[in-house]
C-alpha cells in the first residue's frame, strides 16, 4: 500500500502532534538523507551528516559542563557555517541560543549575557581572544577537525525537548533604552517554517543566509531550510551590498529563496534592479514597502514571487504576508497582508476594543508565533502581552503598529508606528507620512525622515529628511520638492531635505537612522565653524538665526529668509527676545514677519540702533486692505435662484475647514442629517486615503466619529490657495455642478502673524471658493467669520453697538491694532458685503469666542482660552482686565444656529448673523471667567489669584509657561498708548443679534443658550486636564484648515 502524501498543512499538524523539538526534527532529516547538502559557505560545504556530527560533538562538551535545560548560551561568531553549527549544537544540548552581533563592543556583549546569567559562549577563531569573561567553546569550521562517519548514529541523537522549549533569545535594537531580551519558542519557528507565505519550502530549495544572526529573520535563513530538508547558502554582507555581484552569486549558487529587508530592495532599485530576478521567493520586510522601488524592480526583472512580510521579533519572523503584484504598484499602496498559518490578528482602539474594518487601530497578534515574553521585565510583559475578551487565543502581543483592515478584501494596511510619532518643536508628527509625501513628489527613489536634536542652544529638535535623488533629477529637485510638500503638508511637517547618494544600512540591513542623525550634525558642525567670527550686524543676526534654527546661516546669504529656513512661531518669539538682548533694541513680531530676510531685518536693526522709530502701520497697508476687498468684484452673480440644498434630491455639501475644531463638529452634525447624502471635504492631503484618515482623526479627536460616517464622507485633496482649490480645472468644474451648497470655514488662524501670511489662504482662498460658488449651478455660500473682524473698535473708535449688516469700513481705524487673522477677516467680509449688495447668494455668520461642547465638555485644548486656563493654573495667577468680554459661545450652540439658519435659504440669503450670547446679561466678563476658573481651582494644590496685567506679564516672562510661550509677543508688545493688543479689547461693544433672534424664532422647541457657569467651566477644565497629558502642538493658533 503506497504511503500517504500529506498536504503542507497536514504535515504541520503532524509535527505539532509529535511535539519533537527543532534539533530532533533536523536529526530525522539527517538520518533519512545524510548526504544531502545542508550548508554552503564559499568553498566550504556541509552535508546533513557533517552538520549533525559537528553539532553533536559541541553538544557533548556543553553537556559535560552540566548545561541546564534552556540555559542561555552566547554565540559570538562571524556570519557563516560556524553560526549554523553553534545554534544546532546548543539545541542538541537542550540549551537556548543567544546570538550576539560580533561587531558589538565587548562591554555590550558582556552586559547582555550577564543579565541572562550565561556561563558559556561559543566563539570562532576570529573571536576567541575577546575580553568576554565566560567559559568559551570554540566552533571550528575546518573539516580536518572532524572525523567522517558512514552514517548518522542513533546514540548521537539530540536531547529530547518539546515545541515549548525556549530555543533562542533575541535582543531588540534598544534605540531608546536597554535592549529587550525576547524569548523565542520552538513552536514559533515551526509555525513560520511550515507556513512560509504562499509557497512551501521544498528539499530542492536553496535558501540565502543573508541576515545577521542577532536579527530574528536569520531564524528563517537557518531553520526553514534545515527543517524542510533544503540547503542554506551563506551570503556575506559584502556580497549582499554589491547588488550586481549578488545577482551573479544567486545565479551561480542556484539560490531560490531569500528573506531580506526593504532597505536592500530599495538599494537594488537604485543600483541593479535585476538583482532578484532568479529567485523563486523573495521576502522583504523590516520597514514600509517603497512603491517607487518595487515599480522599478517589476519593470527590470522581478522575482517569481515578491512577498511583503511583516512580523516583529515578539511574533517571530513573519506573522502577516502579502504577495506583491503590479496592481499594488498601480494603486500606490502595498498591504502587509493577512495572517499566516494559525496566526490571529486583531485591530483594537486605545481601550483594547476591536475596531470595525476600515478603521485605524493598533495591531495585536495572537497564535503560536507569539513570544513567551521578555526576560526579567515583568512590567513590560504586562504592558505588551495582553488578553482579549472573547478570543480563543490566551495571549496577544501589542505591536505598537497602527494599521487598517480593508473593507473590500480583508488585507491589512500599515499606517505607522504608535511610537514612530515624533514631537518636533511641540508638534506631533508621523514620520511615515512625511516620507510618503516626499516620495509622491516623484523626485526621489528613497526617503527617510527623522528627528534630529540640534547641537545649538534654543534650536530644539529639527525635522530632517535624507533622500536619494532619481537619476536624471534636476539640480533644483530639493527646492521643487519642498514647494510641492508645502502644498500638501502643514508647515511643521515640511522637513529640511538633505541629499545622499545611497541610504546607509546597519548590521540588520535596515536603514541606519543613527548614522543619518550624526551625519546631519557633522554637516552642520562643518558649516558652522567660521560663523562665530562674524562681528557685523548681519553676521551677529545670522549667528542668532543659526543658534535658534540649528542650521547654518552664512551672513553672506542676502536671500536667507528666517521662515523659509523652517522657523516656527515659537522660534520667532525667541528671536525677538534674543534681538533685544543682543542689540538692545525692540522689534515687533509683525516687523519680523514683514522683514524676514536676513538683509532686510539687519537693515531694520541698524535703523533701530541709530534711533529710527518704527512706524506701526503704514498707510499703504490700509490701502491694500481696501484694494483686496475688491478682488472678487469681477465675479458675475448667478442668474438662477440657488438650489434648496435640503431637498431629498440634493443634500451634497462642499465643506472647507473640516479638520478644524468648529469644522469637525459641523461635519459631524451634517453627516448625521438624513437629508445630507454626501459631504465633500477639501483637505490638505497627498491622496484620498490620507485625506480620509485626516478627517476621521479630526472627528475622533473630539469623540465624534461614528461608523456610518464613512459612507457619506468624500475627501477632496486640495488647498484654498490654489485657483482651482488644488482640484484641477476639470474636477473643480465637476464639483461646482455636483455641490448643492457650500460651507466655508477653512482659514489660517495665527494670533502672531501679519496679514501678508493670512492673505493667501483667507483672502485669496475665499476668492477661489467664490469662483466655485459661481461655477456650475447656483448655490448658497455660507461663510463662517468672527466678531474679531471689527478689531478693538470699542477702544479705538468708541463704538458702543455693532449692527449685523452695518458697513465694515467704519471700523477700519481699529484694524491696525489687531493681528493678521482679524485683518484678513475684515477684508473677506468687506469683499462679501460688496458681492451681497450685487445679489450674490451669501450668508455670513459671526460667532463670538467659540468654546467647547456644552454637554460633553470637548473643547479645543489649543485655542487661546484653553492655553490661558492651563497656563494661569501653572502660574497661580491671571490678569485682571476690566470691561472685557470674549462673548463665549459653545460649539454645539454655534452649529445649531448655523444649520437652522442655513436650512431656510430663501430668508437667510444676503444677511449677516451674530452668534453671541442672546443678551448682555449672559455675556461673561473676562475677569468673571477667570475668577470662575480660580474658584474651581480652590482646594487643589494651588489656587489662582487675580493680579494687575503688568504684574501678570512679569510673572509670564519669569515663568514662561509652555502653553503661552508662542503668544508672548502678542501679550507683551505695546501697540497703542502703552497698551498691548489684549488690553486694547477693553470696552467691547454690544453685538446686535436682531437677525439671529428672528431666525431662531422658528427653531423647533426653541434653542436654549448654554451659559458659561461653574458647571460648564468644570466640564471644560476636566476635559483639558485629561487632554493635558496628550501631545500638544507648539502653536495651534497657527494652521490652515482647508
UniProtKB/Swiss-Prot annotation:
Listed EC numbers: 1.2.1.101
Q: Which InterPro entries match?
A: AA_adenyl_dom, ACP-like_sf, AMP-bd_C_sf, AMP-binding_CS, AMP-dep_synth/lig_dom, Far_NAD-bd, NAD(P)-bd_dom_sf, PKS_PP-bd
Reactions catalysed: L-tyrosinal + AMP + diphosphate + NADP(+) = L-tyrosine + ATP + NADPH + H(+)
User: Could you say which protein family the record assigns here?
Assistant: Belongs to the NRP synthetase family.
* Gene Ontology biological process terms, A to Z: biosynthetic process
* Region annotation Adenylation (A) domain: where it falls in the sequence: 29-425
Q: What UniProt keywords apply to this chain's record, in alphabetical order?
A: Ligase, Multifunctional enzyme, Oxidoreductase, Phosphopantetheine, Phosphoprotein
Loss of this gene results in the following:
Abolishes the production of piperazines and suppresses the formation of sclerotia when lnbA is also disrupted.
Q: What is this protein called?
A: Aldehyde reductase lnaA
- UniProt lists the gene as lnaA
Q: Where is this region: Short-chain dehydrogenase/reductase (R) domain?
A: 655-897
What domain of life does the UniProt record list for this protein's source? Answer: Eukaryota
> Has UniProt tagged this entry with the keyword Ligase?
yes
User: Disulfide pairs?
Assistant: none
Domains: entry comment: NRP synthetases are composed of discrete domains (adenylation (A), thiolation (T) or peptidyl carrier protein (PCP) and condensation (C) domains) which when grouped together are referred to as a single module. Each module is responsible for the recognition (via the A domain) and incorporation of a single amino acid into the growing peptide product. Thus, an NRP synthetase is generally composed of one or more modules and can terminate in a thioesterase domain (TE) that releases the newly synthesized peptide from the enzyme.
Q: What does this protein do?
A: Non-canonical nonribosomal peptide synthetase; part of the lna gene cluster that mediates the biosynthesis of diastereomeric piperazines. Lna and lnb clusters encode sets of enzymes that produce overlapping sets of previously undescribed metabolites such as piperazinomycin-like metabolites or morpholine. The lna and lnb biosynthetic pathways appear to be part of a signaling network that controls the formation of sclerotia, a resilient overwintering structure. One primary function of the non-canonical nonribosomal peptide synthetases lnaA and lnbA consists in the reduction of L-tyrosine.
One annotated GO molecular function: ligase activity
Q: What induces it?
A: Expression is regulated by a complex signaling network which may include cross-pathway interactions mediated by sensing of the cluster final products or shared biosynthetic intermediates.
Q: Which residues carry this modification: O-(pantetheine 4'-phosphoryl)serine?
A: 569
Q: Which residues form the Carrier domain?
A: 532-609
Species assigned in the record: Aspergillus flavus (strain ATCC 200026 / FGSC A1120 / IAM 13836 / NRRL 3357 / JCM 12722 / SRRC 167)
What does the record give as its pathway?
Secondary metabolite biosynthesis
Amino acid at each position: 500500500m503506497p504511503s500517504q502524501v500529506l498536504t503542507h498543512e497536514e504535515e504541520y499538524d503532524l509535527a505539532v502532534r509529535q511535539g519533537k523539538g527543532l534539533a530532533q526534527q533536523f536529526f530525522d532529516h539527517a538520518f533519512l538523507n545524510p548526504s544531502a547538502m545542508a550548508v554552503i559557505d564559499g568553498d566550504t560545504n556541509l552535508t546533513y551528516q557533517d552538520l549533525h556530527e559537528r553539532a553533536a560533538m559541541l553538544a557533548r562538551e556543553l553537556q559535560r559542563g552540566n548545561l541546564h535545560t534552556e540555559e542561555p548560551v552566547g554565540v559570538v561568531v562571524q556570519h557563516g557555517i560556524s553560526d549554523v553549527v553553534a545554534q544546532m549544537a546548543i539545541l542538541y544540548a537542550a540549551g537556548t541560543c543567544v546570538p550576539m552581533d560580533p561587531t558589538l563592543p565587548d562591554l555590550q556583549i558582556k552586559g547582555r549575557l550577564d543579565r541572562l546569567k550565561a556561563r558559556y559562549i561559543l566563539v570562532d577563531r576570529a573571536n576567541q581572544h575577546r575580553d568576554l569573561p565566560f567559559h568559551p567553546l570554540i566552533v571550528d569550521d575546518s573539516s580536518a577537525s572532524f572525523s567522517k562517519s558512514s552514517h548518522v548514529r542513533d546514540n548521537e541523537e539530540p536531547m529530547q525537548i518539546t515545541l515549548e522549549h525556549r530555543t533562542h533569545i533575541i535582543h531588540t535594537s534598544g534605540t531608546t533604552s536597554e535592549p529587550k531580551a525576547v524569548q523565542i519558542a520552538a513552536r514559533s519557528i515551526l509555525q513560520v517554517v511550515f507556513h512560509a507565505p504562499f509557497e512551501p519550502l521544498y528539499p530542492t530549495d536553496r535558501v540565502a543566509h543573508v541576515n545577521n544572526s542577532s536579527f530574528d529573520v536569520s531564524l528563517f535563513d537557518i531553520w526553514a531550510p534545515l527543517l524542510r530538508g533544503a540547503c542554506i547558502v551563506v551570503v556575506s554582507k559584502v556580497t549582499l551590498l554589491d547588488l550586481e555581484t549578488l545577482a551573479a552569486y544567486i545565479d551561480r549558487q542556484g539560490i531560490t529563496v531569500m528573506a531580506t529587508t526593504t532597505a536592500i530592495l530599495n538599494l537594488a532599485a537604485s543600483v541593479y534592479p535585476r538583482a532578484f530576478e532568479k529567485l523563486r521567493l523573495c521576502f522583504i520586510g523590516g520597514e514600509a514597502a517603497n512603491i517607487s522601488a518595487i515599480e522599478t524592480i517589476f519593470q527590470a526583472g522581478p522575482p517569481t514571487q515578491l512577498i511583503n512580510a511583516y512580523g516583529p521579533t515578539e511574533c517571530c519572523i513573519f506573522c502577516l504576508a502579502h504577495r506583491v503584484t503590479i496592481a499594488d504598484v498601480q494603486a500606490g499602496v502595498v498591504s502587509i497582508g493577512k495572517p499566516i498559518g494559525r496566526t490571529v490578528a486583531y485591530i483594537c482602539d486605545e481601550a483594547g476594543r476591536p475596531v470595525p474594518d476600515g478603521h485605524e487601530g493598533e495591531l495585536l497578534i495572537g497564535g503560536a508565533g507569539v513570544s513567551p515574553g521578555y526576560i526579567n521585565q515583568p512590567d513590560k510583559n504586562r504592558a505588551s502581552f495582553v488578553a482579549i475578551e472573547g478570543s480563543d487565543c490566551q495571549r496577544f502581543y501589542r505591536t505598537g503598529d497602527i494599521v487598517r483592515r480593508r473593507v473590500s478584501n480583508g488585507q491589512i494596511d500599515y499606517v505607522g508606528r504608535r511610537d514612530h510619532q515624533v514631537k518636533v518643536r511641540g508638534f506631533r508628527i508621523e514620520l511615515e507620512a512625511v516620507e510618503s509625501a516626499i516620495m509622491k513628489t516623484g523626485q526621489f527613489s528613497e526617503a527617510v525622515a527623522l528627528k534630529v536634536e540640534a547641537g545649538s542652544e534654543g534650536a530644539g529638535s529639527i525635522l530632517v529628511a535624507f533622500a536619494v535623488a532619481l537619476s536624471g533629477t534636476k539640480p533644483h529637485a530639493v527646492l521643487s520638492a519642498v514647494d510641492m510638500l508645502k502644498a500638501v503638508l502643514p508647515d511643521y511637517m515640511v522637513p529640511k531635505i538633505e541629499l545622499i547618494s545611497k541610504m546607509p544600512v546597519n548590521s540588520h540591513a535596515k536603514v541606519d537612522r543613527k548614522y543619518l542623525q550624526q551625519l546631519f550634525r557633522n554637516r552642520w558642525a562643518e558649516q558652522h565653524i567660521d560663523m562665530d567670527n562674524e562681528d557685523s550686524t548681519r553676521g551677529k543676526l545670522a549667528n542668532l538665526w543659526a543658534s535658534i534654527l540649528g542650521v547654518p546661516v552664512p551672513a553672506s546669504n542676502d536671500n536667507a529668509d528666517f521662515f523659509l529656513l523652517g522657523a516656527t512661531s515659537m522660534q520667532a518669539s525667541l528671536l525677538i527676545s534674543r534681538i533685544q538682548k543682543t542689540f538692545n533694541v525692540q522689534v515687533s513680531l509683525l516687523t519680523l514677519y514683514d522683514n524676514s530676510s536676513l538683509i532686510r531685518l539687519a537693515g531694520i536693526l541698524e535703523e533701530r540702533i541709530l534711533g529710527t522709530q518704527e512706524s506701526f502701520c503704514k498707510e499703504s497697508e490700509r490701502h491694500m486692505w481696501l484694494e483686496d476687498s475688491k478682488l472678487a468684484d469681477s465675479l458675475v452673480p448667478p442668474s438662477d435662484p440657488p438650489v434648496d440644498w435640503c431637498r431629498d434630491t440634493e443634500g451634497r455639501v462642499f465643506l472647507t475647514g473640516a479638520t478644524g475644531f468648529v469644522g469637525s463638529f459641523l461635519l459631524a452634525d451634517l453627516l448625521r442629517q438624513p437629508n445630507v447624502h454626501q459631504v465633500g471635504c477639501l483637505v490638505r492631503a497627498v491622496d484620498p486615503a490620507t485625506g480620509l484618515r485626516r478627517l476621521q482623526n479630526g472627528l475622533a479627536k473630539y469623540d465624534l466619529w461614528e461608523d456610518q460616517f464613512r459612507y457619506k464622507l468624500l475627501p477632496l485633496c486640495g488647498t484654498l490657495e490654489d485657483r482651482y482649490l488644488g482640484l484641477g480645472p476639470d474636477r473643480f468644474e465637476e464639483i461646482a455642478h455636483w455641490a448643492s451648497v457650500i460651507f466655508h470655514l477653512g482659514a489660517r488662524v495665527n494670533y502672531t502673524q501679519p496679514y501678508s501670511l493670512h492673505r493667501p489662504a483667507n483672502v485669496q482662498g475665499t476668492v477661489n471658493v467664490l469662483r466655485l460658488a459661481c461655477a456650475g449651478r447656483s448655490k448658497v455660500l455660507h461663510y463662517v467669520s468672527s466678531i474679531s473682524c471689527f478689531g478693538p473698535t470699542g477702544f479705538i473708535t468708541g463704538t458702543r453697538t455693532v449692527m449685523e449688516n452695518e458697513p465694515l469700513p467704519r471700523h477700519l481705524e481699529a484694524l491696525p491694532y489687531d493681528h493678521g487673522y482679524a485683518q484678513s477677516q475684515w477684508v473677506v467680509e468687506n469683499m462679501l458685503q460688496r458681492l451681497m449688495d450685487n445679489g450674490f447668494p451669501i450668508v455670513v455668520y459671526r460667532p463670538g469666542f467659540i468654546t467647547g461642547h456644552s454637554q460633553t465638555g470637548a473643547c479645543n485644548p489649543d485655542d487661546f482660552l484653553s492655553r490661558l486656563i492651563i497656563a494661569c493654573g501653572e502660574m497661580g495667577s491671571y490678569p485682571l482686565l476690566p470691561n472685557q468680554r470674549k462673548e463665549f459661545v459653545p460649539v454645539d450652540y454655534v452649529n445649531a444656529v448655523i444649520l437652522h439658519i442655513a436650512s431656510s435659504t430663501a430668508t437667510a440669503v444676503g444677511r449677516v448673523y451674530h452668534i453671541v450670547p442672546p443678551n448682555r446679561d449672559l455675556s461673561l466678563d473676562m475677569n468673571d471667567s477667570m475668577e470662575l476658573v480660580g474658584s474651581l481651582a480652590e482646594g487643589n494644590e494651588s489656587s489662582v489669584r487675580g493680579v494687575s496685567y503688568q504684574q501678570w506679564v512679569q510673572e509670564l516672562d519669569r515663568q514662561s509657561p509652555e502653553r503661552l510661550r508662542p503668544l508672548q509677543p502678542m501679550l507683551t508688545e505695546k501697540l497703542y498708548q502703552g497698551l498691548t493688543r489684549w488690553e486694547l479689547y477693553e470696552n467691547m461693544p454690544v453685538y446686535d443679534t436682531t437677525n439671529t433672534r428672528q431666525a431662531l424664532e422658528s427653531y423647533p422647541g426653541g434653542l436654549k443658550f448654554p451659559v458659561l457657569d461653574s458647571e460648564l467651566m468644570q466640564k471644560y477644565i476636566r476635559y483639558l486636564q485629561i487632554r493635558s497629558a496628550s501631545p500638544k502642538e507648539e502653536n495651534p493658533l497657527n494652521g490652515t484648515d482647508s
